């Protein structure tokens, strides 16, 4: 598989920050074999989605996934060589005719889920001067390209990536990918977006990105990223988060996230000029925390991101709705509690309520986001209520096994025609196992 790597301004800027010469990393002395790890991750997932207005109202799927990830250490020397490899398999436990469609399993004819799907891949890697380079199948998580991990198996991307950590607290990264393997498929495909009515001919040939992440100041995190989805958009992201401890019991946490998205090249999805931001303020007192958030989309197209991915780092992105329609305003209240305060460590819960409003008569009709337009959508409103309960075993043979129960209720008025009324229940059991 060949990759046409183009040195865009993003990569020139990233390369300029990497030292030309530095002492070789001490951790490469671990060796190719001595520094190797093998981790297994088993996930059992059950999804029940009841969309009130859909042709298939009661969608139910249940599956078992397994992921094996091997990561070698590095050979000795100024430049160390290493190898990563992974294998995944997903098995259908339930999802018969007429009930498929929750997206944890691949779809087949007659609304039946396939019985099994699997994939394997790997990446070569080099490390030197505090810089790591990888080429092959990548697990990525950042604000402009993040593999989806909310289903049974994780999403991966095929391409190259480089990471530099020369300065304590500062991480620089960049890369370019040309294909993705979605979380419910075996094979790779070109990259498309989540909310557009995109045809295969409009898929992008590649995505390039570069960014910086700062965590070197106590209580402060900040990120700046830029990405080019070829012939679709340029997307820029920035965030700032600060945790201020008032005393040993109480802390305050304000934060802000901002995206700017602009069409580029052939503009395959049409004209895009979108600014989307969210702010949050959390008060934590002991084992309790309360969060208030506000989110706003400025633009006649929705805020969009990579299909089936998680690169929406916004406060009001919920289990069912992202509250990201054209020109939408939304707010959220959330309460979290850690039951360690009652002598039950490992048990936690979260309850949130979100509400949004948009004028969909102003949504663009001349782009691939035309489905959001509604001539009667001047007063489009919707809300979502989410309730999560999670338990992580603290000791014994089941240590680190977690059970997550999630329930969401979503309702919209007739003016919000692009989204369903929905009741959704999920059960996710994760068991990570470190072999060596």
Language-model-detected regions and their locations in the chain:
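Outer membrane beta-barrel
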Residues: 70-102, 109-190, 212-216, 220, ...
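Outer-membrane beta-barrel translocator/channel fold
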Residues: 91, 173-197, 201-203, 249-330, ...
């Amino acid at each position: 598989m060949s990759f046409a790597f183009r040195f865009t301004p993003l990569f020139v800027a990233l390369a300029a920050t990497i030292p030309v010469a530095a002492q070789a990393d001490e951790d490469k002395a671990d060796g190719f074999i001595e520094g190797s790890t093998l981790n297994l991750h088993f996930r059992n997932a059950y999804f029940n989605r009841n969309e009130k207005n859909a042709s298939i109202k009661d969608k139910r799927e249940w599956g078992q996934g397994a992921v094996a990830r091997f990561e070698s250490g590095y050979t000795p020397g100024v430049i160390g060589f290493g190898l990563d490899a992974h294998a995944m398999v997903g098995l259908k436990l339930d999802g018969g005719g007429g009930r498929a469609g929750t997206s944890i399993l691949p779809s087949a004819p007659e609304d039946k889920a396939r019985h099994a799907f699997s994939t394997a891949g790997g990446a070569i890697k080099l490390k030197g001067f505090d810089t790591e380079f990888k080429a092959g199948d990548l697990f990525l998580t950042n604000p402009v390209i993040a593999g989806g991990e909310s289903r049974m198996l994780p999403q991966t991307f095929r391409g190259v990536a480089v990471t530099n950590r020369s300065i304590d607290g500062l991480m620089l990264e960049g890369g370019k990918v040309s294909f993705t393997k979605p979380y419910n498929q075996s094979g790779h495909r070109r990259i498309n977006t989540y909310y557009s009515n995109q045809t295969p001919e409009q898929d992008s040939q590649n995505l390039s990105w570069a960014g910086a992440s700062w965590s070197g100041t106590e209580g402060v995190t900040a990120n700046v990223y830029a990405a080019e989805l070829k012939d679709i958009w340029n997307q820029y992201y920035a965030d700032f988060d600060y945790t201020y401890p008032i005393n040993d019991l109480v802390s305050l946490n304000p934060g802000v996230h901002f995206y700017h998205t602009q069409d580029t090249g052939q503009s395959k999805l049409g004209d895009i000029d979108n600014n989307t931001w969210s702010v949050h303020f959390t008060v934590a007192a002991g084992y309790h925390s309360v969060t208030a958030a506000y989110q706003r989309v400025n633009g006649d197209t929705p805020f969009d991101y990579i299909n089936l991915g998680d690169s929406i780092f916004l406060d009001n992105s919920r289990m069912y709705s992202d509250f990201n329609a054209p020109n939408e305003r939304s707010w959220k209240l959330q309460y979290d509690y850690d039951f360690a305060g009652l002598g039950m460590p490992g048990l936690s819960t979260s309850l949130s309520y979100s509400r949004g409003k948009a004028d969909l008569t102003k949504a663009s009709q001349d782009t691939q986001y035309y489905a959001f337009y509604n001539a009667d959508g001047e007063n489009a409103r919707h809300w979502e209520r989410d309730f999560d309960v999670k338990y992580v075993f603290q000791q014994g043979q089941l240590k680190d096994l977690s059970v997550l129960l999630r329930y969401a209720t979503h309702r919209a008025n007739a003016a919000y025609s692009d989204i369903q009324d929905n009741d959704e229940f999920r059960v996710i059991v994760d068991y990570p196992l470190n072999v060596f």
